[in-house]
Amino acid sequence: MQIRYSASPVSASLFKDWEHVVLRMLLLIGACLLGLNAQAATGDIATIDRSVWPEALETPQLFDVASRAQILSFAHQLLESENLSDIQLADRLGLRQLNMATVNLIRNRLWARLFDNWKAAEQSCEADASFCVLVDDVPMLRQRAAEYKVADDSFYARWAAPADAFSQRYLNELLRMAALFPQTSSEVERYNSDELSGDEMPDRTFLLNFESGPTAADGATDWLADFMRQQKINATFFVLGKSLQSRIDSTSPQALQTLYRQQCVGLQGWEYRSHAHWNGWQDSIERTATLTQQMLPDNFVPLFRPPYGHRRADSAQFFRDQQLRVSLWNIDSQDGTGRISAEQTAHRVLTLMLLWRRGNIVFHDTTDKAQQAVPWLMANLAQSGISWEDCHIYPQQLSDEADQDAPEDEDSDEPEDQQRADQPQQSTDQAEEPGEQGE
């Protein structure tokens, strides 16, 4: 006898309801996966294999050739991005909404910086005319960017496509930060003229920064500080108060002073967390400043490095009262993300040095990548004509130069740039704490 199962009206209805639920869940999962894929694509870190560049940077002129090439590649991608609609740009950056006012502000700043860098890089065109084109102003630079193309039979042909990919990804990094600013603060823009970024340095001048330390004894911090002394250069180590106290407790104040001998030590707060939406952000900075000045009076520099670049838009007066300056950066190694290798980190930094020609280079002394990347940079740039800034005179040198340039009859005590007139003035900085430590 064959037994047949027939669904009752109730069971059939329940089945259809479950069918709809499962279908909705599958659609939701699919949408999430697509969103994650889009975010992963737009969130790719810009890297490049420097071996595709055919010449060692063994003279200042060859540094300039590579610099001019990188400037043109990036300028071409910047120009191309301006042809995108707001919707297309949002999709490319993986964002729902864009702050186009800040995006356009940053684009204009980028053009101005690229033009300044081009004028510096073209000084050696008589010695080597590679990538030399006539550029008298920003509109002409935009025209050259539109015309830019590396011929298939060029000596530099292997470099062209990887360079364009790097430039587009790096531009995405900058425009994404711009699109979120000032709601989410970052290093892409300053809130006032007291804040530093590294753009203030002279051409071919760079300062190494190591942050998030110190490590436990005999860790990466020790290795890097020793290496700096061996190379007869110095760097600014931005320390976390909690880690500094732990290092003191496990060793001694004398050992700490030996660790940072000849180096500079700035502040990064008590913990590595956003100082934009932490109720205890002021106490975090004050506690770290007090401890650092007590333990390392000869190394202390009055600079605060905000974790993730996050700080409050209304914090300027606090920092003035504390006699501190916010120190941002313009060359991010991305070594703290855990997503690129030490070699990729080194190649990325060198490429950005060619593009920006000056600035603060940020590494983390809590990872082992800087131990490989920094020596590689030193070796590959030894004859390039660059110089490493002395951390002891930065930014005091800038302050002295500003005092010399100021009008003699200027007696106003009002702080400059309470809020910059050329950028959005409100910041809620509502972003959640980043999931990864690093810039």
What do these predicted ranges mean?
Residues 211-212:
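Alpha-helical, coiled-coil/dimerization segments enriched in small aliphatic residues
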Residues 182-199, 275-293, 346-349:
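Short, composition-biased local secondary-structure segments
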Residues 2-5, 15-17, 22-30, 37-208, ...:
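Terminal accessory/targeting
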Residues 138, 142-144, 150, 154-158, ...:
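Metal-dependent polysaccharide deacetylase catalytic core of the NodB/CE4 family, i.e.
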Residues 342-354:
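A short, acidic, amphipathic alpha-helical segment used as a generic capping/interface helix at domain edges
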Residues 277-280, 339-343, 371-376, 402-403:
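Histidine/acidic-residue-rich catalytic or RNA/ligand-binding cores of hydrolases
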